Amino acid sequence: MAETGRNQGSGLAPNIASVLCYVAAPFTSIVFMLVEKENKDVQFHAWQGTVFGVGTIAVLFAIEIVSWILGAIFSFLGILIGFLVPMVWFAAIIVWIICVVKAYQGERWKLPILGDMAAQRAGI
């Protein structure tokens, strides 16, 4: 579960460092991935934050591209697909809040599929 004590690289408590991995993911998570090499909890949250952040950006980008393409062909399809963007944002914010709360509690809460990838990369 959670490792106690202070982190070696940043000097932050592990739960605070884990929360910061999600604050501006994937950017902050990459920083903690490089700085906190010894703490497996922080490494897990850093990897999960990176994969979640990049994945969210990729999905939103893909929806926008598909919306533009279909909008050029059939305007109503572009508009319908364009409605997915706010729904994806809302879902991502809910998942982000859950990740932040669980990280603060010192829990390794795994996102489906992404959590297993993060655990593998973190060496857990």
Regions found by a protein language model. Give the residues of each.
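Hydrophobic alpha-helical transmembrane segments in multi-pass membrane proteins
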Residues: 17-35, 48-99
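Membrane-interface extramembranous regions at the lipid-water interface
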Residues: 1-55, 101-124
